[in-house]
Amino acid sequence: MKDFIAIDFETANECPSSVCSIGAVLVRDGEIVNSFYSLIRPEPDYYKWFCQQVHGLGHEDTDDAQVFPYVWNRMLSELLEEVEILSEDTSEMPTAIPLVAHNAGFDSRCLREVFRCYRMDYPEFVFHDTLAASKKYFQGTLENHQLQTVAAACGYDLTNHHHALADAEACAWIAREIL
């Protein structure tokens, strides 16, 4: 796969709409050409202890952050500024370029639910899953198929796991290798 956006969300609590950070990496012709990271004020705006233990984020990080619709539009504008796939209406994600995530079921659900939460029109994104792809590609040769394990098998050193941009970068690397 040569053209895609690798995306990763971290959530504040058990609600899929509670995205508190986003990382995205644009890959064109097999090369990483741009990336984006932002904190997001989650909705609902509360943190579960378990989630904080995973990613280390809390109210002190996101109380002054923008809500999702503003971050999404800024991401599209910044990530795709040099690319001709962005429509004039930056509220619409170009669905011609697929999204890639490790455990895409989680990230696609987060995206769908946060769009629903803010009553944004949800385009039918095409998602590819590096978790599912790694199970086929490595066929039982890995201890597990967690992001850091698969990234290492693909030659990528993921040093800041559960930081949304670091995870999106690892996902992009994996996708370039096995999709």
Region roles according to the model:
Residues 79-81, 129, 139, 175-179:
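Short alpha-helix boundary/capping motifs
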Residues 128-144:
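Short alpha-helix plus adjacent loop in nuclease-associated cores
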